[in-house]
Amino acid sequence: MTLEQNYTAILGQLGEDVSREGLLDTPKRAAKAMQYLCRGYAQTLEEVTNGALFSSDASEMVMVKDIELYSLCEHHLLPFIGKAHVAYIPNGKVLGLSKVARIVDMYARRLQIQENLSRQIAEAIQQVTGAQGVAVVIEAKHMCMMMRGVEKQNSAMITSVMLGEFRENAATRSEFLSLIK
């Protein structure tokens, strides 16, 4: 059964008339949208970084903040939307600026929980750069909590992962946290 056929079945199970004008192409559009929203499964770290790793004497923190992200909760298939702040301390290599955002997108475009997403991003940056430390903080609003269940509209979830120098050195961690405020 194709994804499109599954969406047709779901609409029918919900009591919808799948032959009505407004729904005629909905299963096809929904299948295409889901494939787009989950395109991270078809990407690899090597593809998204595309060799954009450069020798550098930089030894201070490199940060990209306010990276918009959109993902789908693996429990309800509902979106969570937020921003990621990613920093690393180079160890002879720096990553092309856009590649940090591409790494965030690759992992966000999979069925996820935010806790795992934060860890996956941090570990990927560490793996690619060999950095002395990596820090990731994600703040997101979860539609599964806003539209159903407790229906809390103004709550946000914050997760953080600190590796290497960011975990071991309180001053480095504090500097990062002060910069993302």
Curated annotation (Swiss-Prot):
It comes from the Bacteria. Keywords: GTP-binding, Hydrolase, Nucleotide-binding, One-carbon metabolism. Gene3D superfamilies: 1.10.286.10, 3.30.1130.10. Belongs to the GTP cyclohydrolase I family. Homomer. This is GTP cyclohydrolase 1 2. Pfam families: GTP_cyclohydroI. Pathway: Cofactor biosynthesis; 7,8-dihydroneopterin triphosphate biosynthesis; 7,8-dihydroneopterin triphosphate from GTP: step 1/1. The keyword Nucleotide-binding applies. One of its GO terms (cellular component) is cytoplasm. GO terms for molecular function: GTP binding; GTP cyclohydrolase I activity; zinc ion binding. It catalyses: GTP + H2O = 7,8-dihydroneopterin 3'-triphosphate + formate + H(+). One of its GO terms (biological process) is one-carbon metabolic process. Its EC number is 3.5.4.16.
